[in-house]
Amino acid sequence: MSLVVMATGGTGGHIYPAVATAKELRGRGYEVALMGQKGGMEEGIAEREGLTFYGVDAGKLARSGQGRPDPRQLLKAGQGLAQARRTLAGLNPAAVVGYGGFASLPGVLAAQSLGIPTILHEQNARLGLTQRLAVRRARAVGTAYDKVIGLDPRKATLVGMPVREERMPRAEALAALGLRDGPITIMVMGGSQGSLYLNQQVPGILWRLFGKVGKLRGKGDSVPPIDLDLRGPHLIENARSREVQVLHATGPRWLAEVQPKVENLPWYHVTGYVDAVAAWSVADLGITRAGTGTLAEAAFHGVPLVMVPLPESAENHQYHNAVAVEQAGAGRVVEQKVLPETLEKVVLECAAPGKRAAMRDAAQKRARPGAAARFADLIEVQLRRAPSPTAHAPTAHD
């Protein structure tokens, strides 16, 4: 059967959609492999998923406003392109599918230089730098958003965001995570690598909001730490329904820093890494970054979000992603540059049952189950359009 190579890497937002689509194509009888950065997290994920992996060097390119490119990164990018050309010329795949991010670029550009058909998947609401470099010669682009800034809509097909479409029964997930049934569960997650900002700010914010006992404030409680109208919709009459518990995935590198901050709060559970399916299956509210993978998983599980976009994200794509979710009524955007008190207010407002229910309904409407299957359909359409030309053997100059 035909071989399809997924060019991906860098972050989970690029890698996991590739893995989901790879599994779908493999189920249809295709041979599938991943190509990404040597030693990158994609290599370990491919191994765990039983996917063949081809590693190449990958260099980060400077974006507009970032100054001149680093010559060392340009050298790595050139080396990676040559390595990818040699590998793909030997494999002669039917197509290469690019998922964005600097680690995908060598595979996609090498395929295009060899005449191998390329298809792209754009996960964000704004076309990324690496995708802009490849889009002109790509056969088609599957998108996670109905409108993508910088992408000709005639070349785009809305397929959604391929994610792990798995759920756990709530009781089973709570038990696996060591959480109780009953309290509102707030999940804090900074993406596949964690978030320094969320790790530094959120524990203090949640302690100020919910105190040592872990309860939302109600009538008769002491003056709240921020200026809120106590007659507002955030008030909760039933004391039991005011209980909260937190599941905070810090990322392995920051676990030791965060743990001491919350060790006296029995309702605040910290872990370096968490099983995402279990976490999303119990979350009633998420405090997260705004990578498209995170937003797609939130929609699939119907979890409302308070989103703090990563300001350094490529082309500020996380902000544009988050705005689209907020406009749909499924979350609230709080920019990192604002005062922590603003984040406190938004979290408390979104924790209220009525607000959470409305946001949950909006999140579920955003979900597009079956995205991996739809993108696989698009790939198959392009494979049937014309046979893959035979890749030429690399020359001495390649």
Curated annotation (Swiss-Prot):
Chief location bin: membrane
GO molecular function, a single term: undecaprenyldiphospho-muramoylpentapeptide beta-N-acetylglucosaminyltransferase activity
Keyword terms of this UniProt record: Cell cycle, Cell division, Cell membrane, Cell shape, Cell wall biogenesis/degradation, Glycosyltransferase, Membrane, Peptidoglycan synthesis, Transferase
First and last residue of the signal peptide: none
Enzyme class: transferase
Compartments, record wording: Cell membrane
Xref: Pfam families: Glyco_tran_28_C, Glyco_transf_28
Catalytic activity: di-trans,octa-cis-undecaprenyl diphospho-N-acetyl-alpha-D-muramoyl-L-alanyl-D-glutamyl-meso-2,6-diaminopimeloyl-D-alanyl-D-alanine + UDP-N-acetyl-alpha-D-glucosamine = di-trans,octa-cis-undecaprenyl diphospho-[N-acetyl-alpha-D-glucosaminyl-(1->4)]-N-acetyl-alpha-D-muramoyl-L-alanyl-D-glutamyl-meso-2,6-diaminopimeloyl-D-alanyl-D-alanine + UDP + H(+)
Pathway entry: Cell wall biogenesis; peptidoglycan biosynthesis
GO cellular component: plasma membrane
Any single GO BP term: peptidoglycan biosynthetic process
Family: Belongs to the glycosyltransferase 28 family. MurG subfamily.
Record function comment: Cell wall formation. Catalyzes the transfer of a GlcNAc subunit on undecaprenyl-pyrophosphoryl-MurNAc-pentapeptide (lipid intermediate I) to form undecaprenyl-pyrophosphoryl-MurNAc-(pentapeptide)GlcNAc (lipid intermediate II).
NCBIfam families recorded: murG
Record's protein name: UDP-N-acetylglucosamine--N-acetylmuramyl-(pentapeptide) pyrophosphoryl-undecaprenol N-acetylglucosamine transferase
Organism of provenance: Deinococcus radiodurans (strain ATCC 13939 / DSM 20539 / JCM 16871 / CCUG 27074 / LMG 4051 / NBRC 15346 / NCIMB 9279 / VKM B-1422 / R1)
